[in-house]
From Swiss-Prot:
GO terms for molecular function: 2,3-diketo-5-methylthiopentyl-1-phosphate enolase activity; 2-hydroxy-3-keto-5-methylthiopentenyl-1-phosphate phosphatase activity; acireductone synthase activity; magnesium ion binding. Bifunctional enzyme that catalyzes the enolization of 2,3-diketo-5-methylthiopentyl-1-phosphate (DK-MTP-1-P) into the intermediate 2-hydroxy-3-keto-5-methylthiopentenyl-1-phosphate (HK-MTPenyl-1-P), which is then dephosphorylated to form the acireductone 1,2-dihydroxy-3-keto-5-methylthiopentene (DHK-MTPene). One of its GO terms (biological process) is L-methionine salvage from methylthioadenosine. Its EC number is 3.1.3.77. This is Enolase-phosphatase E1. Binds 1 Mg(2+) ion per subunit. Its cofactor is Mg(2+). Pathway: Amino-acid biosynthesis; L-methionine biosynthesis via salvage pathway; L-methionine from S-methyl-5-thio-alpha-D-ribose 1-phosphate: step 3/6; Amino-acid biosynthesis; L-methionine biosynthesis via salvage pathway; L-methionine from S-methyl-5-thio-alpha-D-ribose 1-phosphate: step 4/6. It catalyses: 5-methylsulfanyl-2,3-dioxopentyl phosphate + H2O = 1,2-dihydroxy-5-(methylsulfanyl)pent-1-en-3-one + phosphate. The lineage of its organism: Bacteria, Pseudomonadati, Pseudomonadota, Alphaproteobacteria, Acetobacterales. Monomer. Belongs to the HAD-like hydrolase superfamily. MasA/MtnC family. It comes from Gluconacetobacter diazotrophicus (strain ATCC 49037 / DSM 5601 / CCUG 37298 / CIP 103539 / LMG 7603 / PAl5). Keywords: Amino-acid biosynthesis, Hydrolase, Magnesium, Metal-binding, Methionine biosynthesis.
Length: 235
């Protein structure tokens, strides 16, 4: 657990299990992308983004049909770049047509709006592609809230369990490690962020069945986070 007492002025947030229920990701987003994948590969084969992802798949799994490899990765919930890119394209179509709309935890948008109004800087770091992150926050049941964030970071900056990834985000944003709070439900990610000097807090959402660790502060809502770290709270 970090010992810094500097005031927090920047917050880096995970998505799944932190701002959005795990059930939405696994019961809505993932099945939608799996069902859409055959058509996406067939109908958009000439799309540069699809071609690039297919080339990456061939490099990672030579001789394996792209759809077979994608299904294998999805079965294992792998965080692989070309899979995330193609899932993002599938979700883009779903959000565009209105078939998808993200449901955030009810405490999220009010808390983030309070923090932004108070001058805090907010950014997202998720294994989902930057495009997918923007789609989620741009199409929520609370409306388009993507503008609350100044940055969206994905696996291109590095894996979420590597301290170097958090150092890279700090270098790109210019944020001070001791004044930056990272929120996630995954202990290994929090460990990496802490190694990079960030403050940390584990979100343990009761509806997700997250198991609390013993190395980081724990909160069940963003309001709990605010109280623990002296951030703006509801009146």
């Amino acid at each position: 657990m970090t010992a810094s007492t500097d005031a927090i002025d920047s917050v880096l947030l995970d998505i799944e299990g932190t701002t959005i229920p795990v059930a939405f990701v696994h019961q809505v987003l993932f099945p939608y992308a799996r069902a859409a994948m055959p058509g996406l590969l067939a109908q958009r084969a000439d799309d540069p983004a699809v071609r690039a992802a297919v080339a990456d798949i061939a490099a990672l799994a030579p001789g394996v049909p792209p759809l077979d490899q994608l299904n294998a990765w999805m079965d294992r919930d792998e965080k692989i770049g070309p899979l995330k890119a193609l899932q993002g394209l599938a979700w883009e179509e779903g959000y565009r047509t209105g078939a998808l709309r993200a449901t955030l935890y009810p405490d999220v948008v009010p808390a983030l709006r309070r923090w932004r109004a108070a001058g805090l800087r907010l950014a997202v770091y998720s294994s989902g592609s930057e495009a997918a992150q923007r789609l989620i926050y741009g199409h929520t049941t609370d409306g388009d809230v993507a503008g609350l964030f100044s940055g969206f970071y994905d696996l291109r900056i590095g894996g979420k369990r590597a301290a170097g990834s958090y150092r890279a985000i700090l270098a790109e944003t210019g944020w001070a490690a001791g004044r930056t709070l990272f929120l996630s439900d995954i202990t290994a990610e929090l460990d990496a962020a802490e190694e990079a000097g960030l403050r940390t807090c584990q979100l343990v959402r009761p509806e997700d069945g997250t198991v609390a660790g013993d190395r980081h502060p724990v909160a069940t809502t963003l309001d709990d986070v605010a109280r623990r770290f002296a951030l703006p709270v509801a009146a």
